[in-house]
Regions:
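Active-site microenvironments of hydrolase-like enzyme catalytic domains
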Residues: 1-23
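Short, low-complexity, polar/charged sequence segments that are solvent-exposed and flexible
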Residues: 9-14, 38-40, 93-98
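Solvent-exposed, acidic/flexible segments
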Residues: 12, 24-35, 81, 85-92
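Active-site-adjacent substrate-binding region
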Residues: 27-57
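Sec/Tat-exported extracytoplasmic proteins
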Residues: 21-23, 42-46, 82, 99, ...
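Active-site-adjacent mobile loop/cap segments within catalytic or ligand-binding domains
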Residues: 51-105
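Homeobox/homeodomain signature
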Residues: 7-9, 43, 59, 64
Length: 105
């Protein structure tokens, strides 16, 4: 549903983001910590862009997503099937700014 995957911030339409963290590896707490910081930055600069952090584990679920390779590995889902390319491109620009602020500290 487009109203779940879309937001407007300062007149610009974005595909919302969802951070996914797999819990089926030894270092998942570090991944969660990093994603929480990134999510906080997203909420500060782009309120309403993030749908939050989805923690995945359990039978039939890939609870790793290569996040066991590095605590800096993140998975960000953008929008949904109803979003258009302009909304997704607006979001990729926002993500680049969010990651810049995260790396900059």
């Amino acid at each position: 549903n487009k109203n779940i995957t879309t937001t407007t911030i300062n007149g610009k339409v974005y595909a919302k983001i969802l951070f996914v963290v797999g819990l089926e590896h030894n270092n998942y707490k570090e991944n969660i910590s990093n994603v929480e910081k990134i999510n906080d930055i997203a909420n500060k600069y782009y309120p309403g862009l993030s749908r939050g952090i989805y923690k995945k584990e359990g039978p039939g679920v890939d609870g790793i997503y290569n996040q066991d390779i590095s605590s800096n590995s993140i998975l960000i889902e953008l929008g949904g099937v109803d979003n258009n390319i302009d909304e997704v491109l607006n979001t990729t620009e926002a993500i680049s700014n969010i990651l810049y602020y995260y790396i900059k500290g």
